[in-house]
Amino acid sequence: DVRKAIEMFRQVNVEVLGVVENMSYYDPPGGGPRQYIFGEGEGRRVAEAFGVPLLGEIEIDPQIRVGGDTGKPVAAQGENALGAKSLYAMARAVAARLEQAKATSVGPSIQID
């Protein structure tokens, strides 16, 4: 569970950059309303509860699975490849969050007596 993971990382002083909600929604081929098979907005609620950003909502897309199974990930096929848009949006959000964290973080303190 993501809540337990966030709590564990905080206990050991590892910064949590944010939440990524996998299998967030399904867009049927040919249009039609977006379907939230596992419920809507849980990733956002968790992110808000822990005070971290929601970095992405990854869609359910058969092309993501096919790409992984064949060793040809959709993300490697470019942003406009079927199934890749949500992955690229999430990657941009993670990169921006890493830059923000890098600008505000202090490195570890090592003391030798």
Pin down the residues of each PLM region:
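Flexible active-site lid/hinge loop adjacent to a nucleotide/diphosphate
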Residues: 2
